[in-house]
Structures are given as C-alpha cells and as structure tokens.
C-alpha cells in the first residue's frame, strides 16, 4: 500500500511532519528517585524554550540535574543532531554543584543560526578528569520552524545551520 507519493524532497518533508508530531521538547522529573540516570548523575530536566522556535528566535536549552558524585564541579556536554544523525554542533559546560547537589544552567543558541528542521539532543556527563559518568541519547527533540520569506526562493535552504552573515558590498 502506498502511503505517500511525491518527489524526494516532498517525501522527506511529509515524513518529517509526521515525526514532528512525536517531538519531545522537554523531559522533567520531580525527584531524583524517579529520574533518568545512575549512581553518579540523575537528570531533573532538559527543556528547549520556546518549545517550537522559529529560525529567527533565540533558542534556550535549559539543563538541571543532581550531581551525586560528591565533586564540587561536573562537566556536561551535548551534541545537537539533525534528522539524519549528523552532529550539527556540540558544547561543553563545567557546572558548579549547589548545596542540594543540583546543577542548573541555560545555553543560548542565537537567533538566525539554526536552519529549519528537526533536531535531537545527546547529553554526556563527565568528571573534571573527563571520565564518562552518564550518556543520554535523544533525550529531547524539537523542530525549528522557518519563517515566511519575501523573496521568490522556493525550497529548503541548504545546511543544518543558517547563520545570518554580515555582507559588505565593496
């Protein structure tokens, strides 16, 4: 049975829209007992704000987790992946643990950097000696939405990122 018929680009877009109905832009746990993780790290929450960003929006990735290692600092890195599992970019941050073992931080992805599409986040927690403590794959997923364009260009702009670059005519 044929479910969809169209060009390759139309087919990819069709299935991306179907998959976007199953996006999970946040994951939250109320207590460390129910949270994802292990004896070292328990995930409290990961969120993308706004949940359905446009390419022209600043995108905030908010992270919160319990550091159960006893160390005062802990590293967390993420890879942002596209629909085809290609790494768009990654980042690392050294968290300082609070009195209640919580670590909280927000990463800002500037407006006009991301192209439209569906993205996933992998998380990696490590000690300051870079010993891997926990890896969480595809922990959240979200779609960055294109804005209406005023020019006659049709179709998706190439690339995973779409930075608004400064051009100087000379």
Which sequence ranges carry the predicted segments?
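Localized sequence-composition bias
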Residues: 1-170
């Amino acid at each position: 049975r044929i479910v969809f018929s169209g060009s390759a680009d139309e087919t990819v877009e069709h299935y991306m829209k179907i998959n976007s109905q199953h996006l999970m832009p946040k994951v939250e746990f109320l207590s460390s007992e129910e949270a994802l993780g292990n004896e070292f790290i328990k995930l409290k929450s990961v969120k993308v704000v706004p949940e359905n960003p446009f390419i022209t929006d600043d995108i905030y990735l908010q992270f919160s987790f319990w550091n159960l290692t006893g160390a005062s600092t802990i590293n967390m890195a993420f890879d942002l992946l596209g629909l085809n599992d290609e790494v768009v970019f990654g980042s690392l941050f050294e968290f300082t643990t609070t009195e209640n073992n919580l670590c909280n931080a927000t990463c800002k992805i500037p407006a006009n950097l991301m192209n439209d599409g569906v993205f996933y986040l992998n998380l990696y927690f490590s000690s300051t000696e870079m010993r891997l403590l926990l890896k969480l794959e595809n922990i959240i997923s979200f779609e960055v939405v294109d804005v209406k364009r005023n020019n006659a260009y049709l179709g998706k702009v190439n690339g995973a990122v779409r930075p608004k670059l400064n051009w100087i005519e000379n």
